[in-house]
Amino acid sequence: MANLLVSTFIFSALLLISTATAATFEILNQCSYTVWAAASPGGGRRLDAGQSWRLDVAAGTKMARIWGRTNCNFDSSGRGRCQTGDCSGGLQCTGWGQPPNTLAEYALNQFNNLDFYDISLVDGFNIPMEFSPTSSNCHRILCTADINGQCPNVLRAPGGCNNPCTVFQTNQYCCTNGQGSCSDTEYSRFFKQRCPDAYSYPQDDPTSTFTCTNTNYRVVFCPRSRLGATGSHQLPIKMVTEEN
């Protein structure tokens, strides 16, 4: 009897695990320039214009993010630097990127088996982005404004636009003193007015977090739907002469 109960428990546990299916992410570069895609977890991949990268992510993955790096130069061993989004000088990222970089963030199979996903500008902005579930029943997030071109002078950075937290490093902008310790500012409103669905500061949750279930996802750099048929967008501020 005891063995039967144990076997039933193990079978039930395995069944629950199997129902929490993994998700596939298609990462597509529709920019007119090369983007070095990065993912944590996942690593990194050079994407020339029109190229894509398929990433299979395990069920239950959380605190995950995908971003694009610009103006990179890597040697044959995958060591080098990027102007924006650099992750410790490696093509294959094992940690998070250096601001400024537009982020697609997600956590799979969380509360009530829901996926949580968002676009965040808390680390600033470098590339316009779409983050969308393949399910038509869930919300498509877009951040395609010309933030680099309109960036306030104090937030400007080579190749992108910093979030004020990166520049000032105070609770007013970083919310380091906990929930309710900060609110929107003139700088967060600059981002929010241009990308209403994206996080503009760390406690911008109510209008910036979305949920879906049982779906795969697409992350698109320079999505064409809002940029015209060619998918053109202002190039990063400084382009390297040799791309690896």
From Swiss-Prot:
UniProt keyword annotations, A-Z: Disulfide bond, Signal
Alphabetized Pfam families for the sequence: Thaumatin (PF00314)
Keyword field contains Nuclease: no
Disulfide bonds listed in the record: C31-C222, C72-C82, C87-C93, C138-C212, C143-C195, C151-C161, C165-C174, C175-C182
PANTHER family in UniProt: OS03G0233200 PROTEIN
Membership in a protein family: Belongs to the thaumatin family.
The protein's name in its UniProt record: Osmotin-like protein OSM34
Phylogenetic placement of the source organism: Eukaryota, Viridiplantae, Streptophyta, Embryophyta, Tracheophyta
